[in-house]
């Protein structure tokens, strides 16, 4: 049986933006992935004290954003899970759902890579997947040796990218909408229309 190489891109996607799509495309092409699965979070444990948009809206925006790319798909497994969202649990679920020989490539930013040794079941995460870490503009390159000291085995699991450097964030999109500014250059057109039609991120 031939192994399937599957990229995993998780996030609140509140909203999904062009930077997410650029990252997914870049990693797919560079590593020769067969597909990329987008996984909107339920209630992330690290954002337990923050209000995020309803899961249905975030899921719908992801579906709209990737509708023209057959090698992208979305799964709602974290949204359906009750309680806090943990990456290790999601990776274990994927191992049971996806074909047996599937290789998982988990995408994250350099900032999240720095925090990874403190994540829930971090050692299990690096056992279940390859890590693919990409920068944002202005971020300092992580000290991989130091991270490996904190989480032995991380370096062996890691693919450290120097690009794409993405300078877009969901918080920037939300802020611009709240201030009545356009976001068509930051999100796909269908997502911009959805935000407007559903009055997301507007001042209450």
UniProtKB/Swiss-Prot annotation:
Enzyme superclass (EC): transferase
GO biological process assignments: NAD biosynthetic process
EC number(s) on file: 2.7.7.18
Reaction catalysis annotation: nicotinate beta-D-ribonucleotide + ATP + H(+) = deamido-NAD(+) + diphosphate
Gene3D superfamilies according to UniProt: HUPs
Pfam family membership, one: CTP_transf_like
InterPro entries: Cyt_trans-like, NadD/NMNAT, Rossmann-like_a/b/a_fold
Domain of life per record: Bacteria
Keywords of the record: ATP-binding, NAD, Nucleotide-binding, Nucleotidyltransferase, Pyridine nucleotide biosynthesis, Transferase
Pathway: Cofactor biosynthesis; NAD(+) biosynthesis; deamido-NAD(+) from nicotinate D-ribonucleotide: step 1/1
UniProt entry tagged with the keyword ATP-binding: yes
Example of a GO MF term: ATP binding
Entry annotated with the keyword Magnesium: no
Signal peptide segment: none
Sequence similarity: Belongs to the NadD family.
Function as written in the Swiss-Prot or TrEMBL entry: Catalyzes the reversible adenylation of nicotinate mononucleotide (NaMN) to nicotinic acid adenine dinucleotide (NaAD).
Name of the protein this chain belongs to: Probable nicotinate-nucleotide adenylyltransferase
């Amino acid at each position: 049986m031939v192994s399937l190489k599957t990229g995993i891109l998780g996030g609140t996607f509140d909203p999904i933006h062009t930077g997410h799509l650029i990252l997914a495309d870049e990693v797919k092409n560079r590593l020769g992935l067969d597909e990329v699965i987008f996984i909107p979070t339920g209630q992330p444990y690290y954002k337990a004290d923050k209000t995020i948009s309803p899961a249905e809206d975030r899921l719908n925006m992801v579906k709209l954003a990737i509708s023209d790319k057959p090698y992208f798909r979305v799964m709602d497994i974290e949204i359906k899970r009750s309680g806090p969202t943990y990456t290790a649990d999601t990776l274990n679920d994927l191992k049971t759902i996806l074909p047996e020989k599937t290789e998982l490539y988990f995408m994250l930013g350099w900032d999240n890579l720095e925090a990874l040794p403190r994540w829930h079941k971090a050692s299990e995460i690096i056992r279940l997947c390859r890590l693919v870490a990409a920068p944002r503009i202005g971020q300092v390159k992580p000290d991989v040796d130091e991270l490996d000291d904190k989480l032995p085995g991380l370096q062996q699991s890691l693919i450290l990218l120097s690009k794409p450097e993405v300078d877009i964030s969901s918080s920037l999109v939300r802020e611009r909408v709240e201030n009545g500014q356009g976001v068509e250059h930051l999100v796909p057109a269908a997502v911009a229309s959805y935000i407007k039609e559903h009055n997301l991120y507007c001042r209450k």
